[in-house]
């Protein structure tokens, strides 16, 4: 009889512990869902990068117009070099974004393939193809 009473008490303690653990887990999940930052899509990020670079180049051009003398052609050569450098940097940034997108797509496909119950899928194919915007052509 004493053994059944202690078993019931242990069962109640265990259920209370599981209830508290579930409640804490649910609260942490809600906190993560509502507090995590919202990520912008890569298309919007690309557009922002290109727009900001165009504004930067225009601002440099205006600054060079204001400070450039008629005989000073060296500043225009520097401007062209700067513009090429920015184009190369933007192209590198966009290539890295595309690689990151492909990795994320691959992980998403693998995750969804692992969660399916059919198990008939062999090698998953990424959802998107490698579509790359050529940044250097649009800036020059």
UniProtKB/Swiss-Prot annotation:
Compartments reported by the entry: Secreted
Predominant cellular place of this UniProt entry's protein: secreted
Pfam families for this protein: MGT5A_N
Location of region: Disordered: 114-140
Source taxon at top rank: Eukaryota
GO cellular component terms given for this protein: extracellular region
InterPro entries (UniProt xref): CCDC126, MGT5A-like_N
Glycosylation sites: 110
N-terminal signal peptide: 1-26
Keywords: Glycoprotein, Secreted, Signal
Protein name: Coiled-coil domain-containing protein 126
Gene source species: Bos taurus (Bovine)
Gene name of the encoded protein: CCDC126
């Amino acid at each position: 009889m004493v053994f059944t009473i202690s078993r019931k008490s242990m069962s109640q303690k265990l259920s209370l512990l599981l209830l508290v653990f579930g409640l804490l887990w649910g609260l942490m999940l809600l906190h993560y869902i509502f507090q995590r930052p919202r990520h912008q899509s890569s298309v919007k990020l690309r557009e922002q990068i290109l727009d900001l670079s165009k504004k930067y180049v225009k601002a440099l051009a205006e600054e060079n117009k204001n400070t450039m003398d008629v005989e000073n052609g060296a500043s225009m050569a520097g401007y062209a070099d700067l513009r090429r450098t920015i184009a190369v940097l933007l192209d590198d940034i966009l290539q890295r974004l595309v690689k990151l997108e492909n990795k994320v797509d691959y992980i998403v496909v693998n995750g969804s393939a692992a969660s399916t119950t059919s198990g008939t899928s062999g090698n998953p194919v990424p959802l998107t193809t490698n579509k790359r915007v050529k940044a250097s052509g649009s800036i020059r």
